[in-house]
């Protein structure tokens, strides 16, 4: 069995776009041929971005529960409000991170990302990730 890893990149996008059209364009531009049995690994943030799951952190209104969690894990209250709102359950954490489940997936800060976004915007976890993966598989 042979394993070859090929990286495909895209410019950062700011706003909703058609994921499938963009992937088609990226693959065509790279001249990579996707064959039966190939495995695609796609960043959840790229999918979230395509769904428009981007928020401005400064617009968050902080509830008392999120304020307590932010103090406990020594993190920004407005950011923690979004983590709290997006998660199904906060199960623990360490300084700077709350471990949370979202759609049955355990991830730091409910999978919410500040590092791959522009300015004070944050990228949420994708809507219905399992359904999206099935749709991608069919296409």
Task: Give residue spans per PLM region.
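N-terminal and secondary-structure boundary signal
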Residues: 1-139
């Amino acid at each position: 069995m042979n394993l070859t890893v090929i990286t495909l990149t895209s410019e950062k996008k700011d706003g909703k776009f058609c994921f499938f059209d963009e992937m088609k364009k990226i693959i065509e531009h790279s001249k990579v041929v996707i064959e039966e049995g190939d495995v695609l690994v796609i960043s959840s943030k790229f999918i979230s971005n395509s769904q428009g799951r981007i928020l401005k952190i400064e617009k968050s209104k902080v509830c008392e529960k999120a304020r307590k969690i932010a103090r406990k894990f020594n993190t920004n209250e407005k950011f923690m409000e979004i983590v709290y709102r997006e998660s199904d359950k906060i199960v623990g954490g360490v300084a700077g991170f709350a471990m949370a489940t979202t759609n049955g997936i355990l991830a730091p800060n409910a999978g919410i990302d500040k590092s791959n976004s522009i300015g004070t915007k944050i990228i949420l976890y994708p809507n219905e990730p399992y359904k999206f993966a099935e749709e991608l598989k069919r296409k």
